Amino acid sequence: MTQNLPQPPAVNAPENELDLVRYLDVLVANRWLIAGIAAAVMLLGAAYAFLARPVYEADIMVQVEDNPNSAKSLLGDVSSLFDVKTDANAEIEILRSRMVVGKAVDNLHLYITAKPRYFPLIGAWISSRATRLSEPGLFGLGGYVWGTESIDVDGFDVPEALEGQPFKLIVLGNGRYRLENKSLDAPIEGVVGEPLEAKQSIGTIQLQVNNLTAKAGATFELERDSRLKTMEMLQDKLKIAEKGKQSGIIGASLDGTNPALTAAIMNQIATEYVAQNIKRKAEEAERSLVFLDGLLPQLKLELERAEMKYNEMRNLRGTFDLSEEGKAFLQESVTVETSLQELKQKRAELLTRFTSSHPGVQAIDQQISVMSGKVNSMTRRLKSLPNIEQDTVRLMRDVQVDNELYVSLLNDMQQLKLVKAGKVGNVRLVDGAAVPEEPVKPKKLTVTPLAGVLGVVLGVMAAFVRNALFGGITDPQDIEEHTGLSVYATVPLSDTQVDLSGQLTTRKRGQYLLARRVPDDPSIEALRSLRTALQFAMQDAGNNLVVLTGPTPGVGKSFVSANLAAVIATGGKRVLLIDADMRKGYLHQYFGKDRKPGLLDLLAGNRSIEQVVHREVVPGLDFIATGLFPHNPSELLLNPRMVELMDTFRSQYDLVLVDTPPVLAVADTAILAARAGLVLLVTRFERSTLGEIRETIKQLQHANVDVRGVVFNALDPNTYRYGYGSRYGRYRYVQYGYTSNSKPPEAESA
C-alpha cells in the first residue's frame, strides 16, 4: 500500500498581476495564428474596399436669418412678427420633418425601387466598369446582368399586402416584359411606355415602365414600399447639424449609391424647406394685414381730429412760439407717447395669434407698464408749464404722434404685402446639392490598413482566448504554486528524440533509447537530476515500487519511463521496467523487443517470470512488455496474482518502475498506484493543464493514493522567447479515445 504522506497545502493562486513577459510569450507562441487572422481580415477589407458599391454624399447649406429687413416701423420690425423664431434644433427638426421630406418622396417616387439584378458580391462591381449591354445570366441562368442595363419606372402601385415584397421584371424583347411575384395569380406581361393595370385576387397591380434598356432574358428587381416607411428611412439617413454654435447656418447631407438621385433628393428637400418657411410667413402676414386694415381708418380719423383741434387753437389764439423748455418737453413727450402707442398696437396684433399668457404678450405688457409710467411722469411735468404752452404742447404732441403712427402703419402694410406675396423669408438656400463626382466611401487607402490593424487586434484576442481555453502549462512553477506538488525535474525537448520517435513508428527493430544513443543529451541530464531526487524521495517511501503516470495520453510518459529506467540502471542499480499499459503500451519498441510474451501472460499464468522478462536490455535493466492487449485489463490488474508478482519483483530488484495508463483516460492506474511506494505524475509543456493535473490528483486521492511529485516534460525553450508563459485553465472532460482495441499511438517524444 502507498504510504499516506501528508499532502502539502496548495499555494493560493496569485492575484491578476501584469506579467508582460508572459503576455509576450503568448503572442510569440501564437504568432502564426495572429498573422493568419490579420492577413484574412486585411484581405476581407481589401475585397470590401474594391468590390463594395461606391457611396456618394450630396449636401446642402441653408441660412436661418434673425431678421431679413432692418427697417423700423410701427411694430418695431414688422417682418420679425412673422418670422418663426426658432433655434437651430427646431429648424433641424423642421428640415427633417415628414412635411418637408414627404415632398421629395412624392416628387421623385422614392418609394419605388427598380434596379438590375446583379450577381451577389461582384455583380455590381463588374457592371460599374462595363461600357455596353451584357448577355444576361451566369452560364445562361439566373438572368443576372453585367453591363450598362437600366430601367426607368414612373409609377408602381400594388396592394398594401404586397408592399415591401420583391418583384422580378424579366425582359422579353421587342419592348415587352414580364412581371413575376409569388403572390400573383400568374405572371403579368406589359409593354414599355404603356400603362399596365392587372387585376389579381389580392388586388390591382399598376405599373408604368418608361424605359427599359437590356437584352432579352435580363432580370430587374422591383419593389414598392409604403410611403410612410420610405419617409422614415429617408429621415433616418439624413445627417443634419448646425455649422458652428448659434451661427444660423445649417448643413444637411445624404449618402447614396446613385449620385444623381442623391443630389436630386437633397435639392428637393431644400426647395420644400424654403417654400414652407415662406408659406408660413405669408400666412402670418395675411392675418396681420387683416388686423392692420381695420386699424388704419381709425388712425387716420384720429390724425384728422388732432389736426383739426390744433388748427382751431391757432385760429383762436394765433401763432405761439414754444419756449426752449417746451420744445424739449414736446420732443420727449412725442417719443414716449409714440412708443407707448406702438407697444399697444403690437400687443393687439400678437393677441390675434396668441393668448395673453404667451411669453411674447407678457413681455409687451411689461414694456407697456414701464412706458405708461413715463407718460404719467410727463403729464405731471406738463402741468408746470404756462396754460397756453400746455395746450400748445398737448395738441402738437397729438398731431405728431398720430402722424408718425399713421405713416409707420402704411409702411408696415407695404412690408406685409411683400411677405404675403412670398417675396420675403427668413430662410435662404446658400448652397444647393451638386452631383458628387467622388465617392466618400469606401476609402480604399484607409479601409485596407484599418482592416490590417483590426486583424492584428482580433488575432491578439484570438491568441489569448486560445491560450485561455486550450493552452497548456508553460511554467513548472505554476504547478507548484497551484497544486502544492514539487516538480522533481524539467525535461527539455530533444531534437534527437524527435528523430528517434519518427524511426520508432516505422516498426523497424532496433534500440531507440535516447539514453543509449546520446547519453549527454540535455533531456538525459534532466533525467539524471530526477534520479538523484528519487534517491532522497525513496527514503520515505513504503517500498521500492515506483509508478509513473500522466493525466492524459501524449505527455511523453513512456519516454520518461524508458530512459529514466536506463539512467538509474547505469548508476549501478538493478532495475525492472514494467509496461503495465495494457491498452496502448509500446515500451517494447524502445528496446527492439516483441510485445509478447508479457505481463498479460504472467497474470494469466501462461508463462513463467523467466519466460517473460527480457534480461539486460540495458546493463542493469530488465524489461517486461505488455503482452497482447486484453479486453479486461482492469479486472486482470485486480487479480491476486498481480500482488504476488509485485512482491516478488520488489524483492528481486533495487527498483521496480511501472509505466501505467493515463489517469483521466482509464481506471487502471489507481489499481497499481495503490500498491506503490512512490507515484510520479508526468506532465507535458503546453499540453497538460492545471485543471487536468488537479483532476488527476483528485481521482488518485479517491483511491487513497498521494502523488509525490511531478515531471515537467518536453519544455521547448524556443517556443517562448521571453519567459515560460502561463496557463490557468480548468480541467475539461474530453474523449481521449483510449481503448484496448485502438492501435498503438505514435511514439511520444520528450
Curated annotation (Swiss-Prot):
It comes from the Bacteria. It is found in: Cell inner membrane. The keyword Disulfide bond does not apply. It catalyses: L-tyrosyl-[protein] + ATP = O-phospho-L-tyrosyl-[protein] + ADP + H(+). Gene3D superfamilies: P-loop containing nucleotide triphosphate hydrolases. The chain crosses the membrane at residues 32-52, 445-465. Keywords: ATP-binding, Cell inner membrane, Cell membrane, Exopolysaccharide synthesis, Kinase, Membrane, Nucleotide-binding, Plasmid, Transferase, Transmembrane, Transmembrane helix, Tyrosine-protein kinase, Virulence. Its main location: membrane. CDD domains: BY-kinase. Belongs to the etk/wzc family. Probably involved in polymerization and/or export of exopolysaccharide EPS I which functions as a virulence factor. May be involved in an ATP-dependent process in the pathway for EPS I production, possibly export of the trimeric repeat units across the inner membrane or their polymerization. NCBIfam families: eps_fam (TIGR01007), eps_transp_fam (TIGR01005). This is Putative tyrosine-protein kinase EpsB. It comes from Ralstonia solanacearum.
